UniProtKB/Swiss-Prot annotation:
It catalyses: (1S,2R)-1-C-(indol-3-yl)glycerol 3-phosphate + L-serine = D-glyceraldehyde 3-phosphate + L-tryptophan + H2O. Disulfide bonds: none annotated. InterPro entries: Aldolase_TIM, RibuloseP-bd_barrel, Trp_synthase_alpha_AS, Trp_synthase_suA. SUPFAM superfamilies: Ribulose-phoshate binding barrel. The active site is at E49 (proton acceptor), D60 (proton acceptor). CDD domains: Tryptophan_synthase_alpha (cd04724). Pathway: Amino-acid biosynthesis; L-tryptophan biosynthesis; L-tryptophan from chorismate: step 5/5. It comes from Paracoccus denitrificans (strain Pd 1222). This is Tryptophan synthase alpha chain. The keyword Glycoprotein does not apply. The gene is trpA. It comes from the Bacteria. Tetramer of two alpha and two beta chains.
């Protein structure tokens, strides 16, 4: 089993919920980003989602787009994000890490997909979320990644109907990421009552944990959404504090409050 599988198995034994925190790799710079990343497990984060900066992030709202631009300006890249993972793994071999991003910087990188998968596994990455690669293109990255031992996590949305859902979950592993609202990150607040039946539908089709993201920015929202799912993701609210240049302890304190909300569901 992967670290992701182990995490959900451990949580399910006690009825616990997973708290997943997203941050952009190399934002605002490599050292600060690594310092924040290293502090996440101690703040209660169960799974870390680490963004790979890209020039044209179509699914991201203004907050995460700005984070990507800051990271790129600081020399951030897929290679540097993998360096972050390697550095993190020197001190933490338990916390799952999921890289989240877009296909172009993976494909266009020297050595392409094969080199990326090899280096990701060697660095200690556990899973991938590639938001612009549909199931019809599974042979490009999803299947080779899974063969190498990586979980490949897909997004389901409010517009993923029962005809589309089987294709979405067919080669998904680790968990399914349910996008609670239609649109980009940092949008309107998630509604737990609306999310609950969708989570049940996806869980039944995928036979996997379902984690809900988008529209969660407070401990109360984390508690409400995690209560109807297997966990929740917070990204933009954390990235916003990083963008404001808040001290690392303040950022981690905010993350700890969010994690406590999710874990109290």
């Amino acid at each position: 089993m992967s670290r992701i599988d182990d995490t959900f198995a451990r949580l399910s034994e006690t009825g616990g919920k997973a708290f997943v925190a997203y941050m952009m790799g190399c934002d605002p710079d490599f050292d600060t980003s690594l310092q924040i990343m290293r502090g996440l497990p101690g703040a209660g984060v169960d799974i870390i989602e680490l963004g790979m900066p890209f020039t044209d992030p179509m699914a991201d709202g203004a907050t995460i787009q700005a984070a990507g631009q800051r990271a790129l300006a600081a020399g951030g890249s897929v290679s540097r994000v993998l360096d972050m993972v390697r550095a993190f793994r020197r001190d933490d071999d338990a916390t799952p890490i999921v890289l989240m991003g877009y296909y172009n910087p993976i494909y266009a990188r020297q050595g392409g997909v094969d080199r990326f998968i090899t280096e990701a596994v060697e660095a200690g990455v556990d899973g991938l979320i590639v938001v612009d690669l549909p199931p019809e293109e599974d042979a490009e990255l999803c299947l080779p990644a899974r063969e190498a031992g990586l979980n490949f996590i897909r997004l389901a949305t409010p517009t993923t109907d029962d005809r589309r859902l089987p294709a979405v979950v067919r080669n998904t592993s680790g968990f399914v990421y349910y996008v609670s609202v239609t649109g980009i990150t940092g949008g309107p607040a998630a509604n737990a009552a609306e999310v609950a039946p969708e989570v049940a539908r996806i869980r039944a089709a995928a036979k996997l944990p379902v984690v809900v993201g988008f529209g969660i920015s407070t401990p109360e929202a984390a508690q409400a959404v995690a209560g109807v799912a297997d966990g929740c993701v917070v990204g933009s609210a954390i990235v916003k504090l990083i963008g404001e240049g808040r001290p690392v302890p303040e950022i981690l304190s905010f993350v700890a409050d969010l994690a406590q909300g999710a874990h109290s569901a």
